[in-house]
Design a protein with these regions (language model features):
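Structural signature of FAD isoalloxazine-binding scaffolds in flavoprotein oxidoreductases
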Residues: 91-108, 121-123
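Short, structured patches in soluble enzyme cores that scaffold and shape functional sites
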Residues: 100-102, 116, 123-127, 131-133, ...
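A mid-sequence, solvent-exposed acidic-amphipathic segment
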Residues: 180-186
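A generic local secondary-structure boundary/capping motif
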Residues: 4, 63-65, 85-88, 112-121, ...
Length: 197
């Protein structure tokens, strides 16, 4: 199951991609993909829906961010060995956790606004996860039970601001438009093979 948001900025409609790659309008079932609606109950409701009966959306429409208004946008720094080596940084013994502001979030093809004074704007492809139910002190064995789905993230950074202006990652990663996401959420419950395999 692939979920996305289609339409001009601020007017996106929630959609599901059918087996023939058509965008089907979910507006009659759900108002948007946000923290209130991205949960396992919603997935069950969508699973029971006759997708072919839903109206098609224009396939040439803008693809928006696949999630709107998330409560948090958290990243794990240097989580890929090759990237750490590329940056001449040691592999951390403990995860480096940072936040990106939710104003970073844009659609996957929307323009990125390079900040004034930037001399080293860079990007990394990451995998984002949608947590579909409350999770506190979850064991490694049960972690995937909380993951509703995943999507692509373009983690944009201004490296000079990040490394040379107080070593605060937010300075380099927090600019508006520095977090394009999507084009869609792939729901884990309906992937084959299972991510557990």
């Amino acid at each position: 199951m692939k979920l996305c948001r289609i339409g001009s900025v601020g007017e996106e409609k929630p959609a599901i991609i059918d087996s023939e790659n058509n965008y089907r309008d979910l507006s009659s079932i759900i108002n948007d993909f946000n923290p209130d609606t991205l949960n396992f109950d919603t997935l069950e409701k969508l699973k029971k829906t006759d997708i072919s009966s839903l109206p098609k959306l224009d396939s040439n429409s803008r693809i928006g961010a696949c999630v709107t208004n998330p409560a948090k946008f958290i990243g794990i720094g240097l989580n890929f060995k090759d990237h750490a080596e590329e940056q001449n940084l040691p592999i951390p013994k403990e995860p480096i956790i940072f936040s990106k502001f939710t104003s970073c979030i844009t659609g996957p093809n929307d323009p990125i606004i390079v900040p004034k004074g930037s001399n080293h704007t860079d990007w990394e492809v990451e995998i984002g996860f949608v947590i579909g139910k409350k999770a506190i002190n979850v064991s490694i064995e049960n972690a995937l039970d909380h993951v509703l789905g995943f999507f692509l993230v373009n983690d944009v950074s201004e490296r000079d601001f990040q490394k040379n202006r107080g070593l605060t990652w937010d300075k380099g990663k927090g600019f508006d438009t520095f977090g394009p996401i999507g084009p869609f959420i792939v729901c884990l419950l309906y992937t084959s093979p299972s991510p557990r395999d």
